[in-house]
Amino acid sequence: MTMESRKGKVIPFAQSATFYMKRGARDMERNDILGALHRYRLAQQAAPDEAAPTLALAEILSYMQRYEESNRLILQLMARGVGTPECHFGLACNYFGMREYDYAVESLENYLDSDPDGPFAADAEDFLDLLDDDLAMLEIAGLMSDADYDANAACVYARHLMDAGDFAAAVSLLKSECQHAPDSVMLKNQLTMAYFCGGERGKAAGVVQELMDSGRDDILTRCNYALLCLARNERQEADAAIDGLLKSDTESPEALHGIAVLLVETDRYSDALNILERLMRIVPYDEQVLHMLGYCRYRLKDFSGAQSCYKRLLRIDPEDTIAKYYLSESRVTDADERRMRSHWVVQYQVPFQEAFKRLAQINRSLLLPEAEQRERWKNDRHFVDLLRWALTLPDVRVKKSILSLLYLFKDERAEAMLRDFLLRPEQPDEQKRMVFGMLKDMGAQEPYMAYLNGRWLQGRVNFLQFSYPLPTPYEAIIGLLLEDMGGMRDQRCLTAAAGIYKRYIESLHQKF
């Protein structure tokens, strides 16, 4: 037998979830976090309706401080009716990391109600005690009074509104909260950013000046001041402010991130690199931090270092087409330095030219016959990843087009992407309400988990049905019931309220 004839093909074969779970546990023992993440993803894909692989994946994502991604996995598991009491404990850990403390308490109470003698019962009790301990929360989160908690909750919601592009709503919310807590620096700093991002720079400057004149400014206030100086082309004042910020020994991720952005925007890449390396010790799996680190290395002509950042991002999320783009750019420039781009997008998104090219590619696909579209959806991984990427764009028209296309496909993958859309705080409520109807028409199992109107909720479409149409104000009450009472608590609360409202409507005998 010759050497040639002895060569054979390596035939891949699917492994069980148990196999990948064992490999993932072994990686964790070796402290190979990204290796374990990969194994647990494979385990979850092999058995998506089993609780153990999903919870293992959610747990490691929580460890990596990717709390929202972890929560989406747990909530989708619960929506499929295969969740376990441990899901509530996992949600509590994530809500705590997301600074959603009321939801953390609610989830812990749900866990203890569903499994009072469960494996995490003692931990849940201790967790609740910590959340009720003013001194502990002051040390951990900088919160002491009820006003502090209210301000924190308002800032969390305002950031979600800003991520969704609704700056006016964020401003309105924060102005209202500032009336109740006029001395809150946290609220004023967030209001500054809401004004700035909404194009009202004069009002943003007014808030910053008020804080600085009163001596209540903090490091985030000074970051905002430097940002406003840059926006007004006052480079000398901005540089002086940034020099002052560099003397800070803060370990606050939010403050360090603000300083890093300013340094990148002013082309001070070496200084930015130092700040980002400090940040990496605190949030080593944060995509925005890794992207800025990659960009700084790229600008400093450390192309292999830049590539390592995007390779790391792709190990975290193999479907991340933004990381794929920047990895490709780094490789091209490494091979030929003359092709070095003068500027990338500091925000974690592809540049406009690349976004335009991708959207043109999607539009060409939309012109294909439906059968060809379905074929691409089924077999073209790149096409699927492009659609997922397009939903991250701020343009509402793009979102509507992609959501309509997913609705057309009506399969398990489309349903999963629609459910995922509902759970993303940065996505607009109007489109989420449309997705509720799409899922209902597709026959997707209820309840539908969502972040809607600033609340995490689980709801059922048409959970109140009548044989006759209701006037708009009465119909709106149903939506309010869903949004205001449909949180993660026991569904019986919503059912009881719905029953009361139904009896009231029926008592009117259609005389509205």
What are these regions (language model features)?
Residues K22, A56, G90, D123-F127, ...:
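Canonical tetratricopeptide repeat
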Residues Q15-A46, Y63, D146-H180, Q190, ...:
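Alpha-helical segment of the N-proximal tetratricopeptide repeat
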Residues E29, Y63, G97, F127-L130, ...:
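Register position in tetratricopeptide repeats
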Residues F96-D133, K247-E251, R281, F303-R339, ...:
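TPR/TPR-like (Sel1-like) alpha-helical repeat modules
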Residues P48, V82, P116, P182, ...:
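Short coil turns that delineate tetratricopeptide repeat
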Residues Q307, D380-T392, D411-L423, A444-N453:
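Amphipathic alpha-helical scaffolding segments comprising HEAT/armadillo-like alpha-solenoid repeats
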Residues P53, C87, A121-A124, A153, ...:
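TPR alpha-solenoid repeat register
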